[in-house]
């Protein structure tokens, strides 16, 4: 499958695999870094909302096959996969210990995002600079949130 309009349907599955890696230890890991921690319920709610958005974006692109839907997908995956991967990788390197989610970030999220991005450029004839800007804007909230968690011990919201 080379068509990003079909492969996007894997994104919800990848999110579930990522959450399966995070779930056993993320709340404890997070709460050891951030004074105003999170509960397991908040973790579940945030990931449930993320799953529903991912499902919606995947179905939107698969159903419409429109350039606008591809840009929405690039923005969302920029947040979900690119930004989230940067959070996990940066945390692991900066703190010198495993950040729950880093394995699926490296093995699933980053390769999928980069593949989807590259295929979307070709398939939708997107300008690379435009697609990069869309992905960067999408990733920005997660990058800011990650910075606050890892380097300031606080959360964005």
Identify the role of each PLM range.
Residues 16-20, 78-87, 138-148:
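Aromatic-anchored segments of alpha-helical transmembrane domains
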Residues 1, 60-71, 120-130:
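Membrane-interface helix-boundary motifs at transmembrane edges
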Residues 20-45:
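Interfacial loop at the N-terminal end of multi-pass membrane proteins
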Residues 115-157:
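Terminal transmembrane helical module of multi-pass membrane proteins
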Residues 89-100:
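Membrane-interface helix caps and helix-loop-helix hairpins in membrane proteins
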Residues 47-61, 81-85, 109:
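Core segments of transmembrane alpha-helices
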Residues 2-21:
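N-terminal signal-anchor transmembrane alpha helix
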Residues 84-91, 110-123:
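Alpha-helical transmembrane segments in multipass membrane proteins, preferentially the mid-helix core
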């Amino acid at each position: 499958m080379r068509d990003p309009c079909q492969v996007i349907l894997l994104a919800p599955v990848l999110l579930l695999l990522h959450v399966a890696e995070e779930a056993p230890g993320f709340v404890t890991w997070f709460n050891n870094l951030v004074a105003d921690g999170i509960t397991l319920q908040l973790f579940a709610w945030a990931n449930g909302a993320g799953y529903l958005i991912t499902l919606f974006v995947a179905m939107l692109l698969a159903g419409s096959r429109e350039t606008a839907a591809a840009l929405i997908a690039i923005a969302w995956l920029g947040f979900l996969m690119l930004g989230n991967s940067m959070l996990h990788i940066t945390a692991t390197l900066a703190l010198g210990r495993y950040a729950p989610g880093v394995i699926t970030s490296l093995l699933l999220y980053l390769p999928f995002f980069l593949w989807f991005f590259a295929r979307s450029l070709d398939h939708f004839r997107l300008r690379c600079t435009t697609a990069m800007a869309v992905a960067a804007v999408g990733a920005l909230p997660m990058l800011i949130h990650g910075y606050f968690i890892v380097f300031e011990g606080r959360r964005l919201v």
